Amino acid sequence: MATPWWTRAAIYQVYPRSFRDLNGDGTGDLRGIVSELPYIAALGVDAVWLSPFYPSPQRDSGYDVADPRAVDPIYGTIEDARELIAQAHARALRVIVDVVPNHSSSERAWFQEALRSEPGSPERARYHFLDGRGLAGDQPPTNWTSWFGGGAWTRVVELDGRPGQWYLHTFDESQPDLNWSNPEVRADGLETLRFWLDMGADGFRVDVALGLAKDMSYPDIDDPESLTLAMRMDLDDGSVDAMNRRRKVANSAVLDRDEVQDVYREWRQVMDEYDGDRMAVAEAWVPPERAARYVAPDTLHQIFNFDFMAAPWDAVRVRGVIEKTMASLSYVGAPPTWALSNHDTPRVVSRLGGGPLGLRRARAMALIAHALPGAVYVYQGEELGLSDALLPDSARQDPVFFRTGGAQLGRDGARVPVPWSGSEPPYGFSDGSLPTWLPQPTDWAAFTVEGEIADPNSALHQYRATLRLRAAHPGLVDQQAFVLPEAPEGVLVLERGAGLRCVVNFTDEAVTSPVSGRVLVASDASVMVEGDRVTLPPSTGAWLQT
Ligand code: NOJ
């Protein structure tokens, strides 16, 4: 029996706000995505993951969902969504949609009903409403903190005008947490899954998959700041300290509780009712020893690998993450996943040093990511080698910036609209009648899709080459064939089947590759081949056919 597509897929993340704007309002839309499906298909990927496009006040760029089974007019209509799925399928691209079960928008009808209802009412029981502590109830019910900074509870004003109960929000106060111990919430979640499955969606990316279950005795936790710190990608340097910060909050009152898997067991049964190998990937940044729970045969299918995303530019550390990842998932038989960036993290070029050096490293890291067994995710613009945009504070939109009083800049720099063509903003992203929702840098002319198509040495050509080979090379198709052989210090070698090897030089000196062969793809034009000898300048790599 053929293995399901998602066990070895390449999946392209589209962030709809910033992909392509066809109606000229400065924000991307679904018809814009349809118009660029040929571009996505030409990359050689198997699927598209769409970040949320549901009705939303956009306080957290759509991760504050007011109606999980509809389309926000800024992105188009439900017919556009249907068309997008149909057109993607016509190009052999699967479609993964985002589901956001941990919380809703405060503008969802449910939350508005809860505000109009009494304490203890069924309407309030869909969320976490509690009386405050202290004689006047003016202290939050627990010491839990929000991932976005500040406290995780906000007090409401009751119908009689008096300050009343508090509600929980792990994120912004406009994102109240849903109560997943409530059967009505559970049933509604299944209805959302069925809605998109019926529409033809091939899978789901499950937002905050580790957060749905809470300890409903609502205990205080030790060191509440650790909750905020543990999830800050900008603080994670792949170190033991960073891992320990996450260990502290894993399997705690608020995160990664074992009961969360009961929800996914129900979800899995629903997905299994449908044909076509539907799948779900968990956004759950948990230590490796907790990961397998999310991808057991009766729970979800994949889990994002944030440790790989956080790995520093260091051959030993990258190797260590790869080995740990493979080991942690092997006993449940789930495929690992690999990603270098997403809409929540600094772009990989910036994370690995920025500028030309960051780009060299990022391109070499992409050779590794694309050569690994399992599934690989590519965040839009990564294939162009984009870095984070520097933005004026006045342009920022991320609630992280506002909730921390500007102490953290937030994630907007990685979310700037994609440059398609031309030499100045909006670079073909929109027709320019209205400003783009985030301003694009004025020096992106060298990074447009059009410019990179014309340059055979561009990041785009490298991504196309490796992603296409991934789909066709027998050594990459075979998921069993994978070895990490010993290599000289500062060099990483990956062996896949059928003579395919990936070699990357992490050092600041040129090295002779310990393996020779024909260069299939190089991360830089300076990689040199003389007879049997392949020379890798600093921060470069190659795929070799031996
Ligand atoms: C993770 C999403 O990727 C992020 O963008 C969002 O802010 C939080 N979850 C809350 O939904």
Give, region by region, the residue ranges found by the protein language model.
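Catalytic cores of alpha/beta
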Residues: 291
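Beta-strand-rich binding/interaction modules
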Residues: 509-525
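Hydrophobic residues within beta-strands of alpha/beta enzymes
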Residues: 48, 204-206
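Generic enzyme active-site microenvironment
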Residues: 96-97, 205, 281, 339-340, ...
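Loop/helix patches that line or flank the sugar-binding groove of alpha-linked glycan CAZymes
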Residues: 5-7, 217-253, 262-277, 286, ...
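Acidic/aromatic-lined carbohydrate-recognition and catalytic surfaces
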Residues: 2-194, 198, 211-285, 418
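C-terminal beta-strand-rich structural cap/linker in extracellular carbohydrate-active enzymes
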Residues: 530-546
